Amino acid sequence: MYTRYRVPILVGSNILTIVLALLIYNALRPAPQNLTQRDIDNAVSRSLQNTPPPPSTASVAYEAIRPSVVVVQTQSTEAGKARSTLGAGVVIAETGLILTCLHVVGDAPQVKVLFADGTESDALVTVRLPEKDLAVLSALKLPDDLQPATLASSASLHVGDEVIAVGNPFGVINSVTDGVVSGLGRQYVSRESGVELTNLIQFDAAVNPGNSGGPLLNRAGEVVGIVASLLNPTSQDVFIGIGFAIPIDDTGSAIGFPPV
């Protein structure tokens, strides 16, 4: 006659056990600690330390222009001796047109270009503008994924703006330097070409022989000028802080279309 009371007694016993277990757990559990401002600052600091820094402006600009920069090399004979020159250029059209400085190619009978993907090609000089020291080359062999550079009006430049130069100084291919616009509307007789160039962009990003014909970029990696010359009072071809670039706005007659 007592069997009908066994289940309720067992259930009640289980409930009591659970309640006691919860009371013991709450008694033994450490009380939560209040976060201080220092705790929050330390947590934020640890998070920032584990977050990689964003790429630099020069890095972003270089990645934008990298597929469009070429090595320009010439071969010629002077006084019975083989002579070669090396400079830079920038692709301005999908058809393989390349903008560079005229003094880079001169009157050399053989001009070769090396694209970013390693494609090498002979090139023809299709446009010569000696009064601006500019030339346009046409490559005979093109990469499958040729990417022209984006041109931007140099009229938007201001003194103090950051600029980036890409070229091949002393044959060190695809070197990147950055600096600022030091002056606008400069006039200079280029030692390389002997031509008096006007309306030049003066900048202090390091350039040396091999940079000529390469692009001068804004922060977005757009071409605002073509590196043309450097000034050194000692008549040595090494950089001392003064470089000159031809504004991209002044290249319209060479490239056949205005910049963006």
Language-model regions: role of each:
Residues 37, 41, 45, 58-62, ...:
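Extracytoplasmic/secreted envelope proteins and their assembly/folding machinery
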Residues 79-82, 93-174, 252:
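Conserved active-site neighborhood of the chymotrypsin/trypsin-like protease fold
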Residues 53-60, 75-95, 119-122, 147-150, ...:
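A conserved glycine-rich beta-strand in the N-terminal activation segment of trypsin-fold
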Residues 25-84, 101-102, 110, 253-257:
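N-terminal activation segment of mature serine protease catalytic domains
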Residues 33, 37, 51-55, 63, ...:
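Solvent-exposed, acidic/flexible segments
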Residues 1-33:
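Single-pass membrane-anchoring alpha-helices
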Residues 44, 70-72, 89, 95-100, ...:
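Terminal peptide-recognition signature
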Residues 28, 32, 78-83, 108-111, ...:
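Active-site loop architecture of trypsin-fold serine endopeptidases
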